[in-house]
Amino acid sequence: MKYYIIAGEPSGDLHGSNLMRGLRKADPEAEFRFWGGDMMAEVGGRENLVKHYREMSFFGFVQVAMNIRTILGQMGDCCRDIKAFAPDVVILIDYPGFNVKIAKFAHGEGIPVHYYIAPKVWAWKEHRVKALKKYVDKLYIIFPFEKEYFPTKGIEPHFEGNPIMDAIAQRCAAAPEESVFRAENGLDERPIVALLAGSRVSEIKANLRFMAELAERMPERQFVVAGVGWIAREQYEIFTKDMPVKFVCDKTYELLQISEAAVVTSGTATLETALIGIPELVVYGIPWLYEKGKPYLLKIPFVSLVNLNLKREAVREMVVYKPSVDEAELELRSILIGGSKREKMLADFDELRSIIGGAGASDRFAADIVQTIQNSKFKIQN
């Protein structure tokens, strides 16, 4: 069968590539056409990559407004390409600002729409639920608490676990020995605190300087920034200049594996850190106006996916206008080896793994997609 897949971010590229491997297992004759990145291209062939996510990375109102003509042009290109390819199914991976509109188009063309990794409408832009209900034939969720949320909105989702477990299993299994990793990346023998300041320039700007200030307080530890390749290193160095921090790029899982603890922004990274088993402090600097309006704007009790899945504050969240370095230092020291909160947090992470489920979710989701489309075709033929 023919699969048209759209991912607009690095995480979507990762999960899309694993899903494509699963689709090929379930359907050896699978044909792919996709929007994504290098990892998806490795599986589906670079000749079938329509657009790289680097050309689609517009975040926030200002960036979107400045690039609206480009975005609308890309949507038009995508719709025309879908029509020309005539897929058996369109698979959308998160990225709702773009993908919800593509869902409407594909639905109008009579093409089945499967949304893999549902948009986080439970956190913001809940109005998108109406479009999901109207235009999406099957919604795939990756967080257990979503099993309770979506039925209240009239949508029966499908859950097979979380593909993050597949990504972690693959990367950690292939990671080099700790001594080799330290030598290759210029890291000394001091215990490591990983700094995950975000995957967007705006997040780096909001969080990294504060994180680096912690390094000045704790010279007995080695603070290492987990950078991402699509952000120029200079963007990090603006906020770490003359600060005692080190830098590695595109090696977040490998770095976390050998870290004593981590300071992490909100988002998927909080969950990844916990599933790898590294105690963490969640810090996110927000605008003053947003802090004042947070009680009215935020629809969820926590911002960390760890806490949302456990339904309690297992990791400390400091989501404020100006986080206190003194307070953050105390919290960080409490989760280091010998700290008062470390063992309880590690036990909570064990519980989290049991809730999320083990590896293999990508294959299970893929098998369900193939079976669903095949069943649909059989009904039409008969």
Model-derived features with residue positions:
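Nucleotide-activated sugar donor-binding and catalytic core shared by glycosyltransferases
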Residues: 1-382
